[in-house]
C-alpha cells in the first residue's frame, strides 16, 4: 500500500514537510511495519491515511510548539530519547525528520527492539540507536540520567507515572513531551501538584485537532524546575 504524501497538509499544520528522501523513508517504514505485523503485533493502525495521521503526523506534532516557541532549538544537534517506543513512535519519524539529532529508542520488549534494529538498518538511520530496558531503571543509569535535551513519551498510562519516568532523563534545560488524548483543567491541577513534588514544571499544554479525523489531541511540555 502507498502512503499519501499530503505535503500541503504537512506545511499547513506543522509548518514542515518531508523532502523526497524523507517521504521515501516514511514509505519504507510503513512497509516494514506492515511486514512486521505479520510476525507479531506492532500496531492496529495499518490503513495508509490512518497510519499517516496517527503515527507519522502525530509523532511530529509534538514538536510543533517548539517550532513556534524555540525555533532555534530545533536547528541544534540535540539528544532525544523516546521512552516506551513500541513500534518506533514517535522516535523513528523524529529521527527521519531531524537527521542532525541523536535519537535513542527505549523499550522493555526484546522483540520490539529487534524489529527496531531492522528498521534502523534498512532505513540507514545513522542517528538512531536502541536501548533495551525499563524507563524507571534506565533513567537512573549514569549514562542516561540527565543526558537528554528532549524526552518523548507517547504511552497511554497514568500521566503522573509518565512524568516520573521522564524527568530523570532530562538535562537541566531539557524538555519532556508527553503525548495525550483528552485533557482537562482538573488534569492540569493534578499534574501541577505531582510535578511540584517531583521537581518539575509545566511549560505549555498545547491542544490541537488532527488534520484528517479531526480528533482532539494534547501535548504536555514539561521541564525541571
From Swiss-Prot:
Q: Where in the cell is it found?
A: Cytoplasm
Please name one Pfam family that this protein belongs to: GidB
Q: Which Gene3D superfamilies match?
A: Vaccinia Virus protein VP39
Matches recorded under PANTHER family:
S-ADENOSYL-L-METHIONINE-DEPENDENT METHYLTRANSFERASES SUPERFAMILY PROTEIN
Q: Give the record's keywords alphabetically.
A: Cytoplasm, Methyltransferase, rRNA processing, S-adenosyl-L-methionine, Transferase
> What is the top-level taxon of the source organism?
Bacteria
Gene Ontology molecular function terms on file: rRNA (guanine-N7-)-methyltransferase activity
Q: Which NCBIfam families does this UniProt record tie to the protein?
A: rsmG_gidB (TIGR00138)
CDD domains, A to Z: AdoMet_MTases
Q: Which residues bind S-adenosyl-L-methionine?
A: 84, 89, 107-109, 135-136, 154
Q: Which organism is it from?
A: Microcystis aeruginosa (strain NIES-843 / IAM M-2473)
Name of the molecule in the record: Ribosomal RNA small subunit methyltransferase G
Amino acid at each position: 500500500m502507498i502512503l499519501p504524501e499530503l505535503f500541503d497538509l504537512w506545511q499547513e499544520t506543522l509548518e514542515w514537510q518531508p523532502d523526497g528522501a524523507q517521504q521515501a523513508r516514511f514509505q519504507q517504514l510503513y512497509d516494514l511495519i506492515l511486514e512486521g505485523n505479520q510476525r507479531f503485533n506492532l500496531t492496529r493502525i495499518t490503513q495508509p491515511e490512518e497510519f499517516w495521521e496517527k503515527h507519522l503526523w502525530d509523532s511530529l506534532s509534538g514538536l510543533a510548539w517548539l517550532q513556534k516557541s524555540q525555533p532555534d532549538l530545533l536547528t541544534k544537534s540535540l539528544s532525544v530519547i523516546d521512552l516506551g517506543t513500541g513500534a518506533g513512535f514517535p522516535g523513528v519519524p523524529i529521527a527521519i525528520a531531524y537527521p542532525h539529532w541523536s535519537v535513542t529508542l527505549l523499550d522493555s520488549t526484546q522483540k520490539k527492539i529487534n524489529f527496531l534494529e531492522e528498521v534502523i538498518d534498512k532505513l540507514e538511520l545513522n542517528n538512531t540507536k536502541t536501548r533495551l530496558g525499563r524507563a524507571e531503571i534506565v533513567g537512573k543509569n549514569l549514562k542516561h540520567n540527565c543526558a537528554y535535551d528532549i524526552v518523548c513519551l507517547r504511552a497511554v498510562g497514568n500521566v503522573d507515572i509518565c512524568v516520573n519516568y521522564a524527568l530523570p532523563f532530562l538535562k537541566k534545560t531539557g524538555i519532556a513531551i508527553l503525548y495525550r488524548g483528552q485533557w482537562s483543567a482538573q488534569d492540569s491541577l493534578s499534574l501541577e501538584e505531582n510535578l511540584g513534588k517531583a521537581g518539575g514544571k509545566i511549560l505549555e499544554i498545547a491542544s490541537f485537532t488532527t488534520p484528517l479525523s479531526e480528533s482532539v489531541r494534547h501535548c504536555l511540555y514539561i521541564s525541571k524546575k
